[in-house]
Amino acid sequence: MSSDIKIKVQSFGRFLSNMVMPNIGAFIAWGIITALFIPTGWLPNETLAKLVGPMITYLLPLLIGYTGGKLVGGERGGVVGAITTMGVIVGADMPMFLGSMIAGPLGGWCIKHFDRWVDGKIKSGFEMLVNNFSAGIIGMILAILAFLGIGPIVEALSKMLAAGVNFMVVHDMLPLASIFVEPAKILFLNNAINHGIFSPLGIQQSHELGKSIFFLIEANPGPGMGVLLAYMFFGRGSAKQSAGGAAIIHFLGGIHEIYFPYVLMNPRLILAVILGGMTGVFTLTILGGGLVSPASPGSILAVLAMTPKGAYFANIAGVCAAMAVSFVVSAILLKTSKVKEEDDIEAATRRMQDMKAESKGASPLSAGDVTNDLSHVRKIIVACDAGMGSSAMGAGVLRKKIQDAGLSQISVTNSAINNLPPDVDLVITHRDLTERAMRQVPQAQHISLTNFLDSGLYTSLTERLVAAQRHTANEEKVKDSLKDSFDDSSANLFKLGAENIFLGRKAATKEEAIRFAGEQLVKGGYVEPEYVQAMLDREKLTPTYLGESIAVPHGTVEAKDRVLKTGVVFCQYPEGVRFGEEEDDIARLVIGIAARNNEHIQVITSLTNALDDESVIERLAHTTSVDEVLELLAGRK
């Protein structure tokens, strides 16, 4: 599946589930009332059972319609969406969940486009009149159209779907649904499948039969639990160590996303969850299992809470059978894996890349065209598809580390990707969702991960945030302490001429590049010849590679008396020179510095400000124009 198609499918599924998930509390309330008070319930009560019909016929579809309209057209969209949904409800003889998913967004879309059309055209004093009557008239028209057209069409469509489902049930084909459901879950379509497809079908079946198997096709925690148990006994390295905690969160907490990375780590395990899912559905079909309402989240506790009287054995058997088959298949696949230590190698490789990125001042597993300066970060959001389970746990882990580090000015929360606010500074998402997040808030920095409970990544990020905040604080302290002798005008101090710029250079070693920069400082009258050796001596103490293709060689403290006046030479090495300790610590911009007293602090600060943009660095590394270099360093970009 291509990236664009996957994002579109995720977005559409996300939209469907966004209409249902905010109203899950209402579904659960209806499910509990049904389980308790209907004639076959735990506490049969003819009076209280009268709540069941109106809630499923009117309340739940209206809530979905209102939410769908609000998603598209705001508050006014929600009102018109609810009015339109009422037309669908009255126009059909069955609960209109699918109809409300069409009518609600349609109402929101119509009022949204009407508001755009009249924007700026309403005379002063008539705004409230137009707003109220437009919503009423458009809602009336859409309700009539929904009553006459959408309702009957959706009713016919629902009957066709029901016939198809009944065909699958009668011919014992329902387990085949797991072939599509389980892989789709791994692509983070689990909420879309459960709340966008199975919940509407399940509610209708539950209303007729008192329970529905559809609520357990996707929500069954058995297949994922089997995979995690297999990792606990037969996994290796960090995957084995973390599987126990993940199993508790998955099985009791109902956060299914927690096991996705374990399957992605070894894609062959998709076969295990498919076979486990098929076994679970088959067992539920044979034994007559099902729930009265959606189990959200998909925890064994939620499953038991939504189980009607007489279905406990069937539901528990369905979960256990799915878990057992998934465990056996996963164990076989893990034990016979041709690539030994596969999960360890991938984890170690990612950790190595994270640590290397950290050492060079880059975000671990950062994605997109973003800056790596974290000094401005004040708002961090851990985002997932639904903005609930997995991201909430990740945000909790990171929040504790941030608080323990004393970074009280930084807030850490969780959110659904579609609800990311424009003022977020840093977004953390699963790697399969990062592209969607970048489209939602392109101005923010983005970090990808493969496991929302990756403590190592959060520790690395916290350390970088601490370092960035400390650097900013130290810079302010330096400026305050030197303000009397400090000239904040970079034009007075940091002023390059064409004679200080050397383009298209080549060097085999960093010593050769440093020696050339030193010789140019001597020729420019900035330093005495002995300063060149002091620059080489300084490099032996600690590499002067800053990261981002920049090195700033300069002399030792003892050589300051060899500086005649503050000066800078800019040397470009398009092919690069290795300056750092790592093989890819390649400098393309070598900036030799000589400064008297504390003036080097001002010089470095000025350079940092000028080279704060990655695109500027890229242009400086390849330009053949001295004038362009002068303009870029002067900030005239």
Swiss-Prot record:
Site residues by UniProt (Stabilizes the transition state in the phosphoryl transfer from HPr to EIIA): 538
Enzyme class (EC, first level): transferase
Residues passing through the membrane, by range: 24-45, 50-70, 134-155, 165-185, 273-292, 313-334
Recorded GO MF terms: kinase activity; protein-N(PI)-phosphohistidine-mannitol phosphotransferase system transmembrane transporter activity; protein-phosphocysteine-mannitol phosphotransferase system transporter activity; protein-phosphocysteine-sugar phosphotransferase activity
Periplasmic side: 46-49, 156-164, 293-312
Post-translational modification: An intramolecular phosphotransfer takes places between His-554 and Cys-384.
Alphabetical keyword list: Cell inner membrane, Cell membrane, Kinase, Membrane, Phosphoprotein, Phosphotransferase system, Sugar transport, Transferase, Transmembrane, Transmembrane helix, Transport
GO biological process, one term: sorbitol transmembrane transport
Record's comment describing the protein's domains: The EIIC type-2 domain forms the PTS system translocation channel and contains the specific substrate-binding site. The PTS EIIB type-2 domain is phosphorylated by phospho-EIIA on a cysteinyl residue. Then, it transfers the phosphoryl group to the sugar substrate concomitantly with the sugar uptake processed by the PTS EIIC type-2 domain.
UniProt xrefs under NCBIfam families: mtlA, PRK15083.1
Protein name per the record: PTS system mannitol-specific EIICBA component
Organism: Escherichia coli (strain K12)
Gene giving rise to this polypeptide: mtlA
